[in-house]
Amino acid sequence: MNKKVILMILDGWGKSPDPKVSAIDNANIPFINSLYKNYPSAQLRTDGLNVGLPEGQMGNSEVGHMNLGAGRIVYQDLAKINLAVQNKTLSQEKALKEAFQYAKENNKPIHFLGLLSDGGVHSHTSHLRGLLDAAQNFGLKKTFIHAFTDGRDVDPKSAIATIENLNKYIHNTPAKLASVIGRYYAMDRDKRWERIKLAYDLLVNGKGKPSQDAVLSISNSYQNNITDEFIEPIIMTDDNNNPIATIQEDDVVIFFNFRTDRGRELTEALSQQDFHEQNMHKLNLYYVTLTNYDETYKNVKVIYNKDNITQTLGEVLEKAGKKQIRIAETEKYPHVTFFFSGGREQPFLGESRILKNSPKVATYDLQPEMSAYELTEALIPEIEKTEADFICLNFANGDMVGHTGIMSAAIKACQAVNKCVEKVITAALAHNYTTIVIADHGNCETMINPDGTPNTAHTTNPVPIILVDKELKTIHDGVLGDIAPTILDLMGIKKPEVMTRNSLL
């Protein structure tokens, strides 16, 4: 075969066992529904060991796109770090040992900051517990936790239980909770520096609502309809109303998020550069991150560096002299480029990139179509030119609107995607492209929890794969790692040996 291929990723578009709670099943999406009737389809697993995550763990976009491009199961930091915590080998990691040594010799406090969540998407509470144990065993007396509440990868009101568990865990240890803030502020990834500033001012200047009881403060927030993701800065204080701890020059900071994208902006403000407009000045810190947030950072120590993934689909296409396009809106642009290329930033030879800005709205339920129409308009002329041999396209709507937990908005998102899919596939068929329609993980097919509350998290449901081709009549079930071998099979290119997964044709 020598086909041109479009990989169309409907982000967050899973297969629900219960149509009642599914935005997809409740949406009017005649074109996507017709694809199942007219073309071969099967399903893919995107969770747990199928994508190199711990068993039972829901997939996410970063992991999903990495497996898609790699053509193999990529064992994720989460699985690696979990093992280190279980086997109590975390304290043997060089970067961590050296940070503890520095704190001890210079009598400096250690500030652990990160997402306090069992979601396992950006972080995991077990990793924080492992780090706290390691610090205590090292004999460190001044350890502080700056917790970012989740409510997005887990339920919107789960922070109270998570903080209660943390308080029990650190009772009778030297560790103390120093501050609390929602991830909406501390973990922005869209250059909304005014959000990061709230987190910076809390951590560095102790600016926040004073509290001696974080659980009480959070339940007050709930009464004002502010859920975990949006918790406003809370500074924990002692009996004299002084902050328990703020981050000072020469302190040790350990950022325990293992996923890289949402740790970058706060790290930049604390350690890399001054933001004069926001009055944020970098501090001279002993700064450690659990994984490598950015190769270009100066003076940031990394506990777990990434294994380089080579011979990804992009690289194989480059070697075969093929032209490829990666296209997405801002929210998923790193996924179709950096993650799909196995953690490589620069484009391959013959790779062009099309980025459309995601709309500047507070939350995407306010504009559920996001930038899907703009992406479609930009892509159609490229399909008509037929110069590209491979196109990787991501529609973000199912995931990003799914995260809001608002069913009516998610239905609108699905309907917008349906219109765009119709335009792209119509053009693809007219110009002899084969389109593989898949998702990277589930989300908008489960908008409501069994107890009736909104579900904002990803799911472990399987996702569809539809093979839109004029001749081929079968496609098999598989995992995300099978997609690159399938694409190479369609294009008539031999897959490299390191691509250990299989074509689904």
UniProtKB/Swiss-Prot annotation:
Keyword Disulfide bond: no
Organism this protein belongs to: Flavobacterium psychrophilum (strain ATCC 49511 / DSM 21280 / CIP 103535 / JIP02/86)
Role description: Catalyzes the interconversion of 2-phosphoglycerate and 3-phosphoglycerate.
NCBIfam families according to UniProt: pgm_bpd_ind
Disulfide bonds: none
CC annotations in GO: cytosol
EC number: 5.4.2.12
Reactions catalysed, as given in the entry: (2R)-2-phosphoglycerate = (2R)-3-phosphoglycerate
Enzyme class: isomerase
Gene (UniProt): gpmI
Family: Belongs to the BPG-independent phosphoglycerate mutase family.
HAMAP family found in the cross-reference section: GpmI
Alphabetical list of Gene3D superfamilies matching this protein: Alkaline Phosphatase, subunit A (3.40.720.10), BPG-independent phosphoglycerate mutase, domain B (3.40.1450.10)
InterPro entries: Alkaline_phosphatase_core_sf (IPR017850), BPG-indep_PGM_N (IPR011258), Metalloenzyme (IPR006124), PGAM_B_sf (IPR036646), Pgm_bpd_ind (IPR005995)
Quaternary structure, from the entry: Monomer.
Residues that, per the record, bind Mn(2+) 2: D11, S61, D440, H441
Identification of the protein by name: 2,3-bisphosphoglycerate-independent phosphoglycerate mutase
Annotated positions binding substrate: H122, R152, D153, R183, R189, R259, T260, D261, R262, K332
Annotated binding of Mn(2+) 1, by residue: D399, H403, H458
Required cofactor names: Mn(2+)
One example of a Gene Ontology biological process annotation: glucose catabolic process
SUPFAM superfamilies noted in UniProt: 2,3-Bisphosphoglycerate-independent phosphoglycerate mutase, substrate-binding domain, Alkaline phosphatase-like
Pathway where this protein functions: Carbohydrate degradation; glycolysis; pyruvate from D-glyceraldehyde 3-phosphate: step 3/5
